[in-house]
C-alpha cells in the first residue's frame, strides 16, 4: 500500500491514493478517489441520517446500504461509521485493488463486521440480492463515471418499498445542452445550454428515472437535489405502487425559452409556439420533471437536528447549512431561474443586488426566492418582461 496515504474525512479514516491528493484530475489508477467530492459525501451523510430517522420500517427489516460504484469505499465506509441506523453496508467495485483498499480502511475503523465487499459489474452486484421485496436494500447509491442511465433499472429493482436511491451524473456536457441527441437517448428529454441548464439537467435525471420506475410499478419522490460544476445529484424516495406510478405524468412537462428576449415558461404539453413578447422561436427542453424537488419538512428537521447554531462553526458545515436553508425557501415548483447578470444585461445597466431584486418582485405581488442552483440566481412566477418592468419602475 505504498501508493496510499491515510486521511480522515468526517469521522472516518480512509486509505486513499497519494496521486489523488496531488494531481488536479484524480487518476483512475491504482484506484479512484476524488477529494473535491467531499461536499457531495458530506451532504449524503446528512440526508441518509435524517431519512432513516423518519424511515417507517414496519416490516422490521435489517437496514442496509448498497454502494454500487464503491471505489475505495469513501462513501460506503462513511455510512458505516457515521450513519448508525444502518446495520450492513455492501460495497462493490470492479477494481479489485479498490476493494482491497476499502477492506483495509474498514479495518482501520473497526467496522469489518458491518461491511460486505464484492468485486462485480454493477447490475450483477445489485441483482445478487434475493428478489423478494423484504430482502432488497434500504438505500442504494449510484455514482458512476459518466451517465447513470445504463444502471437505473438495476437500481430500482434492488431497492425496497419506502427506500431511498441517490444518483450522481457526471456527463455534464450531455445534460447541459452540448449533445442534445445523446441526452434525448439517455434521459428521454432535450437539454439546453443556457443560464439555468444545471437545473434542467437535474430535472432530466429525475424525470428519466421516474419514467423507468413507472414502468416497474414504482413511484419516485425527490427529497433533495443539488449540482456542482462537475456533477448533478438527486435523492429519490421509492414507493412500490402501480396507482402512484400512474401519476408520473402529472409532474412532467416542457420548458420554453426565448434566447432573444429571455422570456421563459413551462407547460405540460409540447408545443412549438412563438414567444409572446418578441415573436421569436422558442427553444424547448424536456420532457422533464416540473414537480417539486425538496422534502422541506424533512430538510427542516435535518437542520434542527444536525445543523444547529452550535454545530455550524466549521466552514464546511456552514456551506452545507446554507444550501439546506436556501432549499427550504426555494420555489421548487418553478423549473427554471433567472440570474442577476442576465437581468442586468437586459436592462443594460449594472445589476442590483440579488436580495433587492427579490424584495422588489415580492413587493409587486409575485413570488420570489433564491435558488440552490446558483448563488446569483432567483426563482419567481414573474416573467422576464414583468421583472424588467418592475425594476425599471423602481429605479
Regions found by a protein language model. Name each.
Residues 1-395:
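SAM-dependent transferase fold signal centered on methyltransferase-like domains
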Amino acid at each position: 500500500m505504498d501508493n496510499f496515504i491515510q486521511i480522515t474525512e468526517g469521522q472516518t479514516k480512509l486509505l486513499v491514493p497519494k496521486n489523488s491528493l496531488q494531481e488536479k484530475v484524480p487518476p483512475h489508477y491504482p484506484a479512484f478517489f476524488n477529494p473535491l467530492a467531499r461536499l457531495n459525501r458530506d451532504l449524503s451523510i446528512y440526508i441518509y441520517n435524517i431519512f432513516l430517522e423518519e424511515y417507517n420500517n414496519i416490516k422490521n427489516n435489517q437496514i442496509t446500504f448498497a454502494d454500487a460504484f464503491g471505489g475505495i469505499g469513501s462513501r460506503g465506509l462513511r455510512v458505516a461509521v457515521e450513519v448508525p441506523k444502518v446495520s450492513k453496508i455492501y460495497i462493490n467495485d470492479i477494481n479489485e485493488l479498490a476493494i482491497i483498499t476499502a477492506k483495509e480502511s474498514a479495518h482501520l475503523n473497526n467496522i469489518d463486521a458491518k461491511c460486505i465487499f464484492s468485486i462485480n459489474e454493477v447490475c450483477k452486484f445489485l441483482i445478487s440480492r434475493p428478489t423478494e421485496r423484504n430482502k432488497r436494500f434500504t438505500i442504494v447509491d449510484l455514482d458512476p463515471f459518466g451517465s447513470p442511465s445504463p444502471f437505473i433499472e438495476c437500481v430500482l429493482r434492488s431497492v425496497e418499498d419506502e427506500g431511498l436511491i441517490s444518483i450522481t451524473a457526471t456527463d455534464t456536457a450531455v445534460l447541459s445542452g452540448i449533445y442534445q441527441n445523446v441526452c434525448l437517448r439517455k434521459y428521454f428529454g432535450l437539454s439546453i445550454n443556457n443560464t439555468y441548464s444545471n437545473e434542467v439537467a437535474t430535472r432530466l435525471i429525475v424525470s428519466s428515472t421516474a419514467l423507468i420506475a413507472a414502468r416497474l410499478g414504482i413511484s419516485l419522490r425527490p427529497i433533495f437535489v443539488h449540482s456542482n460544476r462537475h456533477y448533478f445529484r438527486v435523492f429519490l424516495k421509492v414507493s412500490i405502487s402501480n396507482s402512484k406510478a400512474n401519476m408520473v405524468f402529472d409532474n412532467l412537462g416542457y420548458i420554453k425559452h426565448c434566447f432573444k428576449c429571455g422570456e421563459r415558461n413551462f407547460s405540460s404539453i409540447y408545443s412549438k409556439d412563438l414567444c409572446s413578447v418578441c415573436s421569436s422561436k422558442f427553444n424547448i427542453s424536456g420532457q422533464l420533471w416540473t414537480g417539486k424537488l425538496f422534502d422541506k419538512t424533512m430538510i427542516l428537521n435535518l437542520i434542527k437536528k444536525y445543523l444547529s447554531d452550535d454545530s455550524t462553526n466549521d466552514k464546511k458545515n456552514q456551506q452545507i447549512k446554507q444550501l439546506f436553508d436556501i432549499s427550504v425557501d426555494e420555489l421548487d415548483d418553478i423549473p427554471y431561474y433567472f440570474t442577476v447578470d442576465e437581468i442586468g444585461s437586459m436592462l443594460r445597466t449594472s445589476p442590483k443586488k440579488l436580495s433587492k431584486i427579490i424584495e422588489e418582485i415580492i413587493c409587486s405581488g409575485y413570488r420570489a426566492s433564491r435558488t440552490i442552483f446558483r448563488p446569483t440566481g432567483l426563482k419567481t412566477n414573474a416573467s422576464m418582461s414583468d421583472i424588467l418592468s418592475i425594476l425599471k419602475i423602481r429605479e
